[in-house]
Design a protein with these regions (language model features):
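Rossmann-fold cofactor-recognition segment
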Residues: 34-48
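NAD(P)H-binding glycine-rich loop region in Rossmannoid oxidoreductase-like domains
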Residues: 45-85
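NAD(P)-cofactor binding segment of oxidoreductase domains
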Residues: 77-105
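Catalytic helix-loop patch of NAD(P)-dependent Rossmann-fold dehydrogenases
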Residues: 84, 88-92, 112-153, 159, ...
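NAD(P)-dependent short-chain dehydrogenase/reductase
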Residues: 141-189, 195-196, 202-203
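Glycine-rich Rossmann NAD(P)(H)-binding loop
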Residues: 183-188, 213-221, 269
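Mid/C-terminal beta-alpha module of Rossmann-like enzyme folds, strongest
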Residues: 200, 207-252, 257, 292-297
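Amphipathic terminal alpha-helices
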Residues: 276-299
């Protein structure tokens, strides 16, 4: 096993930010992605022998697994897709990590809870209500069985990214085009920015902590509040945010309402404090304006 070497599985939205944070700290990072890309190892999580061989040949001190299927409605119709990537994949990774003594950091989700109560601590019993969430919980359980040295990170996140299909991008695109935005007043979460989350993931990677860990914001926020705070902070004058209840929508997969997490335990483990959404906006406004070409909106 090679000290200070990280194998990062899944260089996507969160993975890229983790990579940046690891490089800032002078770690050696080996990266994988599903599709071919220069300087990045092409890896399909369903190619089990290649996954095992990669981990065993690289001998990293830390393996960070960001690979996941989270297209919730599609997975509800195609549960095998969820099982292959979110259950069997983590099992194979955990087996290989255990064999060579690598520490596994696995990115899970706040959606393992049914959303009836909120502010869930690590010891609360999960109760997934859709195929995606069930597969993520099953993946957690496979890791627990296969591997001793692991951290399962339950979280939710947002950020500025080039992939264009995530919460912040979706809201800002609609605000810019003056499109209607459905703001759910009863969908509540505790998201971290990808940058803040990556800092905390790196903190815990080289800590002595083992087990499940919530990495989340301090205060819950509804999707409606999230939208309104963003629109007001960026000086949108004529935005069309409609207050809605998720009860009025018939998604293919059920959605939990309040998946907010209690991050009390993490405060004694990570060095970087959790930054709530509104505080994050205070020092990220200019980056958002430039990334989304909102300069005219500021006049």
């Amino acid at each position: 096993m090679l000290e200070n070497k990280i194998l990062l599985l899944g260089l996507g939205f969160l993975g890229e930010e983790i990579c940046n944070e690891a490089l800032k700290r002078n770690y050696d990072v080996v990266k994988t992605r599903l599709h071919k890309s220069d300087g990045i190892i092409q890896l399909d999580i369903n190619n089990h022998s290649k996954v095992k061989n990669l981990i065993e040949s690289q001998k990293p001190e830390i393996v960070i697994n960001c690979i996941s299927r989270n297209d919730i409605d599609n997975l509800e119709k195609n549960p095998k897709l969820a099982t292959d990537v979110n259950v069997t994949g983590p099992k194979i990774i955990a087996e290989a990590c255990e064999k060579i003594g690598s520490k596994l950091i696995h990115i899970s989700t706040d959606s393992v809870f049914d959303g009836k109560n909120g502010m869930y601590s690590e010891d609360k019993k999960p109760n997934p209500i859709n195929i995606y969430a069930r597969s993520k919980l099953d993946g957690e359980n496979e890791i627990k069985k296969m591997c001793k040295n692991y951290v399962i990170v339950r979280t939710n996140f947002f950020g500025i990214n080039k992939f264009g299909k995530y919460l912040l991008n979706d809201i800002l695109t609609k605000l810019k085009n003056n499109e209607k935005i459905q703001g759910f007043k009863d969908v509540i979460f505790t998201p971290l920015s990808t940058k803040n989350l990556s800092q905390q993931i790196m903190d815990v990677s080289f800590s002595d902590y083992r087990g499940i860990l919530n990495l989340s914001a301090n205060k819950p926020i509804s999707k409606l509040e999230f939208c309104n705070i963003l629109a007001n902070k960026l000086n949108f004058k004529n935005f069309n945010i409609i207050e809605e209840s998720i009860d009025n929508f018939n998604f293919i997969a059920k959605r939990p309402k309040n998946t907010s997490l209690d991050n009390s335990l993490s405060k004694s483990i990570v060095k970087h404090k959790s930054v709530d959404f509104e505080e994050w906006l205070n020092f990220s406004t200019m980056e958002i304006i430039q990334h989304f070409n909102l300069e005219n909106n500021q006049k």
